[in-house]
């Protein structure tokens, strides 16, 4: 059982637990120990469970009768509870404190069942098409909480950017929202079952922005859970053409929405999602499943469609199809994913997914202008591919 924030030190032969690191920042006190509590402390650093610690100490102290044994057990548990108050040791639990009246809201996205427990006013209306009446047995429960825990979790930094810092410890992932005004942190348990969004105190004028921040913070969590289910989100705009989803992927400002508008005007194809699409890898094919996140386009869908292909757009003065090698198809597709890349294992998952997609769908690059001719060119290429 790992211990955090404290070190055992002797001051003039008297044992103390002295805080360090985050413990100092959280202003947690030093703790005076006696001989028994020193032995408990030593046992905590050796054994993995409460039961093992109690069993070891009972064997060490050898109580004379059952009453002494019970008294010793109670003393041990009381001392360990005292240590737990100061977040000193890892007891493999995930604490949730929600200090206000909450609303339970069940919703399903791409087959993942979720339960929101928090302020109803912070639950985005963008989730409306995904609401469910089934609250029991959610895969993940998402709480909102007014204040951060007094004792702040720390861990190994996986990602640090201007927007977000992601840390990991044995129990949880910690998302520190560097640029958000109201949502400050998000904690996700390592077993993927519990998530807590911590926000500042809110006034009436704050709720609109806070709701947006909660909506996008839940996206971070969903991306992680989806990847665990072999589902990956790609930055792209999508259309429905001949009963399949066709994705146009490019960086922001390259012309995804312009191109889907050309298709709509020329071929009357509806747009599925204006900015993000979820690719679900099955045993035999790839599906595009609806998600509520769609950038600023306001266009999303909750339905599922088979994937036809991915067209990688690049602005160019002349409309032209640029053939890609198999390796380029895989690499460029993976680079358009926004699924987590916090670890090399996550990168490998993304790479495997892109490899599968390249074998089961059309992937090509379109060098394009903003004229109708670009849509006509790739339309002909898609029809040619479908005839193969």
Locate predicted features.
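Hydrophobic positions on the alpha1 helix immediately C-terminal to the Walker A/P-loop
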Residues: 259
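Short helix-coil-helix linker/hinge
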Residues: 31-36
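DNA-recognition alpha helix
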Residues: 53-64
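Conserved glycine(s) of the Walker
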Residues: 254-256
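A noncatalytic interaction/capping subdomain that flanks phosphate/NTP-handling catalytic cores
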Residues: 5, 9-24, 37, 64, ...
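Short capping segments at the starts of secondary-structure elements
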Residues: 43-52
């Amino acid at each position: 059982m790992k211990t955090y924030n404290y070190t055992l030190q002797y001051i003039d032969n008297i044992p103390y637990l002295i805080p360090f690191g985050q413990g100092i920042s959280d202003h947690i006190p030093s703790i005076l120990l006696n001989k028994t509590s020193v032995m408990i402390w030593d046992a905590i650093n050796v054994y993995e469970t409460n039961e093992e610690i109690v069993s070891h100490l009972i064997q060490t102290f050898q109580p004379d009768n059952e009453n002494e044994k019970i008294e010793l057990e109670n003393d041990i548990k009381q001392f360990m509870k005292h240590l737990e108050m100061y977040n000193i040791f890892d007891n493999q639990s995930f604490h949730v404190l929600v200090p206000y009246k909450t609303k339970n809201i069940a919703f399903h996205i791409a087959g993942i069942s979720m339960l929101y427990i928090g302020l109803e006013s912070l639950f985005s209306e963008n989730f409306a098409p995904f609401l469910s009446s089934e609250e029991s047995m959610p895969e993940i429960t998402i709480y909102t909480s007014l204040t951060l825990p007094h004792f702040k979790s720390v861990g190994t930094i996986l990602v640090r950017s201007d927007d977000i810092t992601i840390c990991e410890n044995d129990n949880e992932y910690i998302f520190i929202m560097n640029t958000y005004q109201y949502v400050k942190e998000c904690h996700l348990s390592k077993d993927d079952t519990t998530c807590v969004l911590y926000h500042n105190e809110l006034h009436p004028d704050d709720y609109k922005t806070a709701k947006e921040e909660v909506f996008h913070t839940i996206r971070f969590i969903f991306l992680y859970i989806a990847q665990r289910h072999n589902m990956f989100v790609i930055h792209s705009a999508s259309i429905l053409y001949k009963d399949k989803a066709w994705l146009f992927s490019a960086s922001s400002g390259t012309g995804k929405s312009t191109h889907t508008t050309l298709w709509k005007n020329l071929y009357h194809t509806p747009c599925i999602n204006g900015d993000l699409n979820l690719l679900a890898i099955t045993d035999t094919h790839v599906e595009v499943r609806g998600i509520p996140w769609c950038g600023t386009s306001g266009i999303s869908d909750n339905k599922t469609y088979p994937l036809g292909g991915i067209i990688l757009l690049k602005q160019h003065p002349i409309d032209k199809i640029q053939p890609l090698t198999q390796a380029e198809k895989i690499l460029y597709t993976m680079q358009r994913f926004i699924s987590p890349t916090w670890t090399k294992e996550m990168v490998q998952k993304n790479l495997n997914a892109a490899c599968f997609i390249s074998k089961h769908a059309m992937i090509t690059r379109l060098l394009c202008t903003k004229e109708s001719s670009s849509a006509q060119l790739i339309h002909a290429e898609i029809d040619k591919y479908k005839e193969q």
